[in-house]
Amino acid sequence: MKLPLLRPLWPMLSPAAGSPDSPPEPSKPSLPAAWLLLHALFCATSMAVGFRFSRLIVYLLFLPTPINPTAHLVSLVSPPVMLAAANATTTITTTTTTTTTTVTTTTVAAEVGAHPQHHHHGPVFVGRHPIRVRPWPHPDPNELLKAHHILAAVQNAQRSSRRRGAGPPRPVIAVTPTTTSALQVPSLTSMAHTLRLVDGPLTWIVVEPEHHTDAVAAVLSRSNLNFLHITGPDSSTSRLRMHALREIRKRKMDGVVVFADENSILRTELFDEAQKVKSVGAVPVGVLGEDEGTSETFLQAPSCDAEGKLVGYHVSEETMLPANRGDMLLSSRLEWAGFVVNAQALWEGGGAASRPEWVSDIDAIDDGAAASPLSLVTDAARVEPLASCGQAALAWSHRSDALHEVKFPHEWKIDPPLVTIASRQQDAKPETPLKRTTLLNTEGQH
């Protein structure tokens, strides 16, 4: 085919070739352009066909041996076949043989409808492993639902492990001091739904003044949480909170303590950051303030240097107090929702799991200092900044005492009910609209 290379040999191969001393003949004309185009077309065709067959040979040599080689070869070469038989049935028989038993399973597929369906020849491979294609993932819907629950549980565990690390989560102890007010039942109900989203074991400690109330007990019973309902000697929120911390020390409860006050809104990321605390830690918290008729909104957060060490606290929009000024920090109004504590740091009795020297004794904290979360430490600079010392709020606290004086229905229930019982006469005037009008007038006064 390489005719130009043979051109120098033509005079020697020709029968009429003369002696070497004879004069050279005039050069012959070049090959026509049509012949060159035909030659290029044949070369391209041979390359395409060769690549196709070489690819098929590679598949046959290096892929694992399928169950049905003939069907596997057909599936590689040709697309799936459309079967449109009106009354066709398919029977699939699978035989599994082991050293002791032989199990034969026969599955009869449903009749193919009038509409065509796709059928694959041979098994479908995912990587190097064949899988079985079913028209439905599992014939039993109950088993399918269980499989979805298992997948959801595995995915939640993987997301939680990526957030907090590979180790199991420590127990969470949520402390909530509560007093009777219009916000008590709504706030506790909202907090219960938030705590139910926490990964890992959780104990909810709710402290009431003097005695238990039915409204709080009803919220706790509906929460489906592990709770501890106790009472304190005083109605002050700070004293009730300290009473809960003494109860943790008395019972030697292990875990991380999160302060979930009634006026707080917590994010689930707060509980993930609380897992990192060693003794006492601080997180950013947004504050919505209403003090003496003025409204102020700012972010309370720890302030860090370039190395990530605590240097102060942001206590307002434009004020940052240094960490070494404990007197100024104690006098400032810091929110308990922005601090987390390791429960073992409250224990007494010595040992590795005992209170550090820079953590205050709960019994030695007076009532005036109990309102500040920094009363738990003797050195405010030893507090651990969490959340990478970021400026994104992990909780919000609403400072407002106006709703504590608002009148509200007992347990937020309408008594008598709106539905009239059958024993009453139809022409009798219901008393419920009158009570509803009274409630509206009461709300209008405030």
Swiss-Prot record:
EC number: 2.4.-.-
SUPFAM superfamilies: Nucleotide-diphospho-sugar transferases (SSF53448)
UniProt GO BP: cell wall organization; glucuronoxylan biosynthetic process; plant-type secondary cell wall biogenesis
Statement: the UniProt record of this protein carries the keyword Ion transport: no
Annotated keywords: Cell wall biogenesis/degradation, Glycoprotein, Glycosyltransferase, Golgi apparatus, Membrane, Signal-anchor, Transferase, Transmembrane, Transmembrane helix
Membrane in keyword set: yes
Glycosylation sites: N87
Topological domains, Cytoplasmic: 1-30
GO cellular component annotations of the record: Golgi membrane
Transmembrane segments: 31-51
GO MF assignments: galactosylgalactosylxylosylprotein 3-beta-glucuronosyltransferase activity; xylosyltransferase activity
Location(s) in or outside the cell: Golgi apparatus membrane
Function: Involved in the synthesis of glucuronoxylan hemicellulose in secondary cell walls.
Name of this protein: Probable glucuronosyltransferase Os04g0650300
Organism for this UniProt entry: Oryza sativa subsp. japonica
